[in-house]
């Protein structure tokens, strides 16, 4: 089947036309100018009232259609940025190059990069609803927030007092969600000393790739491998059998992504007295790890190869300190939800490892659907204090607690029988809306961006059509709400 690079002939046509258009505009998180200017121009071209605030949020207002003037307004919300990750060896500049999207069968995906379905499909849905002349709906307060994937600067600085709605529909989730995790992002900074590579020792490069990666909240229950933790295990196995110097190490932050993504790649350069002996130990360790993850990570690749190095190694003490941190920092699923089955309770993700000239950074994302994340963060701080390294709090984001009236929930259950309500494992901006707009009824109704935050990300055309049509039906039913 030939690839459809322009997404033509897909339904709903307006959705895929919009999705293709925004995929041509670089919109990496932290680079909001282009996409927000495009949204403003789009609104102007269609006679829609819209403005952009200082945080680069775009707020658009669509009047109620005839007969819906007395219905409560509805907030529709998506975010305009995307996580930008590319495969090893792919030539792509996210600051200027369009995403090379294509459709094949029931799938829309991208060549060699993240697709941006998270949350481009939500943006495309909203653009289509705003311009549908046949639709029937209450007044729509449409919010496109900026920088959701990193700082959530848009959600933090949005003026919530401007909204009149009693109902809110988020289009940045997976299925029918009624709650989500809160989040704490932290950075661990360790000073790094220098020591010359010992005379006669040879350098080896360790490289881990081929992992799924993905979203550290929504994919936590899958218990995928974290490349940073695998690298730690390789080095620990080597240390038990021999000695080595650690020259540099890095992991995660593929394409600029932060610790919210599970690290899909990691690498290190080490110096050893006997390369053959070290390669033997590392090969055995690699086979052990591949066997452990043979089902969850069938494409895992662990390569060890000779290399040249012209820089100093870490001191032996700093090497041990870093190994202690990589080993002891909590990573992976911590607990499951006490009410909803197969739902995240709490998780911690060591998502970034970066050895720089004078320091080493480890970035950690901690999530929970209750208050357990605060205790997990206390654990991290006390561990780092014991080891004598610095911790920095990057941000703290609220959870989204269940807030749906019985009447609306009954309507939604009947409309979405294939999608039972559940809690999102990820952290979104919904908690800002529900905590700052008293009495707001909030749900998330969105097709799945499968494998988001990875280069395997894709959308199902069938599922997108289902959710788009159901949302149009829902808005029409809200005449008397």
Predicted regions and their residues:
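A conserved active-site cap/scaffold subdomain adjacent to cofactor or substrate pockets
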Residues: 221, 227, 259-332, 336
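Active-site metal-coordination/substrate-binding segment of hydrolases
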Residues: 68-166, 203, 316-319, 331-337, ...
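A short beta-alpha structural unit
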Residues: 20-24, 255, 268-269, 301-313, ...
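Acidic/His- and Gly-rich active-site-bordering loop/insert found
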Residues: 2-106
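Active-site-adjacent substrate-binding region
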Residues: 219, 228-248, 394-440
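Fold-level recognition of mixed alpha/beta catalytic cores in primary-metabolism enzymes, strongest
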Residues: 137-227, 235, 239
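His/Asp/Glu-rich mid-to-C-terminal helical/loop segments that flank catalytic regions of hydrolases
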Residues: 224-241, 274-278, 320-327, 334-338, ...
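Zn-dependent metallopeptidase/amidohydrolase metal-coordination segment
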Residues: 7-15, 338-341, 345-361, 365, ...
């Amino acid at each position: 089947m030939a690839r459809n690079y322009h997404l033509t002939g897909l339904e709903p046509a307006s959705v895929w036309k919009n999705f293709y258009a925004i995929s041509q505009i670089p919109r990496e998180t932290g680079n909001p100018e282009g996409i927000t200017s495009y949204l403003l121009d789009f609104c102007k071209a269609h006679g829609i009232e819209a403005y952009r605030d200082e945080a680069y949020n775009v707020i658009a207002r669509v009047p109620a259609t005839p007969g819906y003037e007395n219905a409560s307004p509805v907030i529709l919300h998506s975010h305009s940025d995307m996580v930008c990750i590319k495969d090893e060896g792919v030539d792509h500049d996210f600051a200027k190059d369009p995403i090379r999207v294509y459709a094949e069968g029931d799938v829309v995906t991208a060549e060699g990069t993240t697709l941006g379905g998270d949350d481009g499909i939500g943006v495309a849905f909203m653009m289509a609803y705003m311009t549908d002349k046949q639709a029937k709906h209450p007044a729509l307060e449409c919010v496109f927030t900026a920088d959701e994937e990193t700082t959530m600067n848009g959600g933090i600085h949005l003026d919530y007092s401007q909204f009149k709605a009693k109902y809110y529909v988020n289009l940045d989730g997976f299925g029918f969600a009624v709650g989500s995790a809160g989040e704490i992002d932290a950075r661990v900074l360790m000073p790094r000393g220098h020591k010359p590579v010992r005379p006669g020792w040879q350098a080896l490069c360790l490289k881990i790739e081929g992992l799924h990666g993905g979203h550290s909240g929504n994919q936590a229950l899958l218990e995928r491998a974290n490349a940073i933790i695998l690298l730690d295990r390789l080095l620990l196995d080597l240390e038990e059998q021999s000695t080595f110097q650690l020259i540099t190490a890095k992991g995660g932050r593929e394409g600029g992504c932060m610790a919210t993504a599970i690290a899909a790649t990691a690498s290190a350069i080490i110096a050893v007295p006997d390369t053959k002996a070290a390669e033997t130990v590392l090969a055995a360790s690699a086979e052990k790890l591949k066997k452990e993850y043979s089902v969850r990570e069938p494409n895992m690749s662990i390569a060890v190869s000779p290399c040249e190095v012209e820089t100093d190694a870490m001191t032996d003490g700093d090497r041990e300190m870093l190994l202690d941190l990589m080993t002891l920092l909590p990573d992976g699923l911590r607990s499951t939800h006490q009410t909803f089955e197969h739902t995240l309770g709490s998780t911690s993700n060591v998502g970034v490892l970066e050895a720089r000239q004078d320091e080493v950074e480890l970035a950690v994302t901690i999530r929970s659907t209750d208050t357990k994340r605060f205790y997990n963060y206390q654990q991290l701080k006390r561990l780092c204090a014991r080891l004598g390294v610095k911790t920095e709090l990057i941000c703290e984001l609220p959870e989204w607690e269940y807030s749906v009236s019985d009447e609306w929930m009954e309507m939604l259950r009947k409309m979405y029988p294939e999608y039972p309500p559940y809690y999102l494992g990820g952290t979104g901006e919904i908690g800002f809306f529900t905590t700052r707009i008293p009495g707001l009824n909030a749900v998330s109704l969105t097709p799945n961006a499968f494998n988001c935050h990875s280069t395997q990300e894709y959308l199902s055309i069938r599922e997108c059509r289902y959710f788009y049509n159901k949302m149009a039906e829902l808005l029409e039913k809200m005449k008397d709400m």
